[in-house]
């Protein structure tokens, strides 16, 4: 029995545990509620840690000023002033709004990356890399389907 428990713990540490502990997030919904409120694509990314295909996001083409909110809970995540064209196929930002995201280690798919989660609902947004422009040198590579754009009034 002890060998089985050890094997399970080792597997979880190598492959990750899926979602962050949902007790840490303000917005709490059942999986049935998430499925009802999100489109299938949003659910796959935000709740299933999926990745949308590159160059498919409508957010790539938004040029106007405004704010990018979490599609799952409406948390303000990024502003258009922090958006830049990375050429990667996903909306990219050099910094989030303070306190709006949580970073955790993602060891899925045989690599180690820094996963970006919404600080309010724990939804998977994308990953952050250290190859971005100034002033931070960071590139928050975000799935556009996880975002809702609200134009500046």
Stretch-by-stretch model annotation:
Residues 2-8:
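Sec-dependent signal peptide recognition
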Residues 9-10, 42:
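Enrichment for repetitive, rod-forming helical segments
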Residues 10-18:
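Hydrophobic h-region of N-terminal signal peptides that target proteins for export
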Residues 19-31:
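Short, contiguous pre-domain boundary segments
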Residues 25-26, 35-37, 41-69, 75-153:
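A short Gly-Trp-Pro
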